Structures are given as structure tokens and as C-alpha cells.
Amino acid sequence: MKTGKTVAVSQTETAIKAILANPIMMTAFRSGLPAEGKLFPDGSKVVKIFWSFKKNEVSPYSVNVPDALKELAFIEKDTKRFPNTHGWAYADWAYDAATDTFKPSQLSQSGAECGYACHTKVSAQDYIFTAYPKR
């Protein structure tokens, strides 16, 4: 996504993520979404870039930094194409360092319903976990 802007960064137990959104979704984020009962417009897109992480050994304080690229995840809203998942489609691509290519992950091979199942926890936020932090 060449026109993606940074929404936020996050860290799980196994990865650091950069979360980017296209201009349609960024406009919605800046207007206050995800908010209770408000929906992202069709055409909204998110890309998440996952890296493993390591401790920066030269920093004077404890900080984790990106290490190896792990995967890319894509989320797109199109209520006509994806009615079974409230308009959201999910795709996940695992990075293969040996071939320097991406391949569909287990999540992608399971279909949009698999990504949707996880996101039902935030249905009140139109199925999007990450908010747009103040800046």
C-alpha cells in the first residue's frame, strides 16, 4: 500500500507490528473511529507488518527493536463482497526468508472467516482492534 499512513505500532509476546491504513481509513480514524456504533466506510484498508524483535544491546535503556520480517496481514472493508464477515476480508502472508518471498499463511488458507472470528471480540468497534492514538 503505497499511500498507507501509520495508525499505530504494537507489540505482542512474539512480534512488533506497524499498522498502516489507506487514506479512506485514515480519514475515518481521524474522525474518531473506531467508536461505539460507528462503521468504517467501504474501501477502508489496513496493512500490518510483523517483525520478530530483539533487545537493542547498545541502547542505554531497555528497548526492543524489529529483527526479522515475519508476515504481512491485510484487512479490507467491502460490504458487498464480504457480507458474511460484516464487510471485512482478511489475508495473512508469511515471509519465507530462504526464498525472500511471501506465501499464504495458515490463516489465509482458512479464509476470511478465520480472521473474522478473532475480530468478533471488537464488534462494537467495527471489528478493528487498534485505535488511532492522539498525536
Question: What is each of the regions a protein language model found here?
Answer:
Residues E13, G37-R135:
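Sequence context surrounding c-type heme c attachment/ligation sites in exported
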Residues M1-D42:
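N-terminal secretory signal peptides
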